[in-house]
Amino acid sequence: MALHDENVVWHSHPVTVAAREQLHGHRGVVLWFTGLSGSGKSTVAGALEEALHQRGVSTYLLDGDNVRYGLCRDLGFSDADRQENIRRVGEVASLMADAGLIVLTAFISPHRAERQLVKERVGHDRFIEIYVNTPLAICEQRDPKGLYKKARAGELRNFTGIDAIYEAPDSPQVHLNGEQLVTNLVSQLLDLLRRRDIIRS
C-alpha cells in the first residue's frame, strides 16, 4: 500500500483513548526497553509485567524473539529488515497503547534514529525509553543463547556489540544499571510509573 493512497482513510472511533484508559484505571503507554543482548531487557520487562499484573494493571509484553515467530517471521537481520522489524513493533505498540494498555517492549533496537521514529509514532508523552546499561563483558558472560560465542568465533555476522554498532541512548527517560538485582530495577520502575501518574497502586 502506498504511504498516501487516496483510497485509504483513517477512521475515528466513538470510544476514545481516554475512555479506554478510564476503564482500565491507568494510562496507556509504551515502555521501550533497549540494550545489548544479555543486558537483561527481557528479564526486567517480564518481571515488571508480572508486578503490574499483580496490581491489576492491563499489560502486554512484546519480546524481540517472540515477534519473529509471527508478525516479523518474513524478516531477516539485514539493516533494512531490522529497521522494518522495529517499525512494525512500534506500530503494534502504539495501537496497544491506544487500547489503554501498558506495553512493554524488549528489543535491542540498536539505532537511535529507529527509536526516535517509534517515539514520534507513539507520541512523546506516551513513550518511555528505558536503557538497560550492562557492560559488554557482563553480557558476554551471561550469553543466555550462546550468541556472543558464535559471534566471536565468526559463525554469526552483524551481531550487535561485536561487529555491529549499538548506539546507546543520549538521554533516556530511564537509565538502569543492568548489574543490579532485578527486584531493585522493578521497584525503580514502579516508582517511576507512580510518580508520572501512569498507575495508581
UniProtKB/Swiss-Prot annotation:
Q: Can you tell me which residues form the catalytic site?
A: 109 (phosphoserine intermediate)
What EC number(s) are associated with this protein in UniProt?
Answer: 2.7.1.25
Q: What is this enzyme's catalytic activity, as reactions? A: adenosine 5'-phosphosulfate + ATP = 3'-phosphoadenylyl sulfate + ADP + H(+)
Which CDD domains did the record assign? APSK (cd02027)
Pathway membership: Sulfur metabolism; hydrogen sulfide biosynthesis; sulfite from sulfate: step 2/3
Key words, A-Z: ATP-binding, Kinase, Nucleotide-binding, Phosphoprotein, Transferase
What family is reported?
A: Belongs to the APS kinase family.
This protein is called Adenylyl-sulfate kinase
Q: Which organism is it from?
A: Salmonella gallinarum (strain 287/91 / NCTC 13346)
